[in-house]
Amino acid sequence: MMMTKILQKVANIWFGARNLAIDVVGGMHTQMMVSGALAFALAGVVPGTAHGGGMQPEQVSFPSLDKGKSGGALTLDGYLFKPDSREPLPAVVMFHGCAGAISVNTGRITSRFTNMAQLLNDMGYAVLIVDSFNPRGVKQICTVPLADRDIKNRHRIMDAYGALQYLNSRPDIVAGKVGAIGFSHGGSGALSAMDATTDAYGRSGQKFAAAVAMYPGCGWQSRKQPEFSAYGPLLILAGEKDDWTPVEPCRTLAVRSQQRNEPVELVVYPGAYHAFDSVSEVYVRKDVPNGVNGTAGVHVGANPAAREAAYKRVREFFHEHLGR
């Protein structure tokens, strides 16, 4: 009886919170609310399962190439979405942005990620969403200056290769047919995962078949020494008006790579800001210290035309390099 009352109270809190929640990019609060994470934790529900479309992710764990506080390999959290199939599947590793995999507003996997997972599942690919933050005790880094962040690009690269090794070891995944896709900070990780000069690539002994970087920050990669060198197909999708992760460093990187005949493609969507694939209207975030406008903030939000064009290009790209 007591447990029933507790669960009833949790349910009331959860559904009340849902009514107050507004799904915005980057986990920014527009109203005070009680997180739905408590309800999920008590009910034992994987945070992606409440999303529409019948998607039921398997919660998995696997080692990163990074070390944990104990000195051993850091164990990562992941959410594996798989279409029904009796045959092994190609797969795509997905990397979240600076707000993490789980929305602070809903307690669920952010809709941009589940929407992309659904698109890729419909193509016949398994999708592994990697949570790089929760295992490190970090909720978000959007509001943290670049120099002060505890999680940097090198951590995302090591997580990427941990995920790649994990998927290649599974009998239900086609080894060697694993791609990557990332958004914003995770887009930088996906981009860097294709860099043949990184330590993680050399240590892993494995390759991603192809990668998509959605509105990544390319500044560090465009300046690094030794120079970024793509070992496989890389597609960068960017917004023309992005003032959080501007397109010009990505253009520099792409042109330089193409001059070396490396398979790097850059697509720039006119009029699009950061996170153009979201469903939220464009608004200004003034709590972000890393954009090009200083204290004036950055623009984030949907551009429906760019979103649909990007989805189409992602389908074409992975069909070409992963099959199906």
Where are these regions (language model features)?
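Acidic catalytic loop of the alpha/beta-hydrolase fold
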Residues: 241-245, 275
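Short beta-strand/loop motif that positions the catalytic acidic residue
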Residues: 236-238
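N-terminal cap/lid segment of alpha/beta-hydrolase-fold proteins
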Residues: 53-86
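Serine-hydrolase catalytic machinery in alpha/beta-hydrolase-like enzymes
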Residues: 75-76, 88-169, 280-281, 286-300
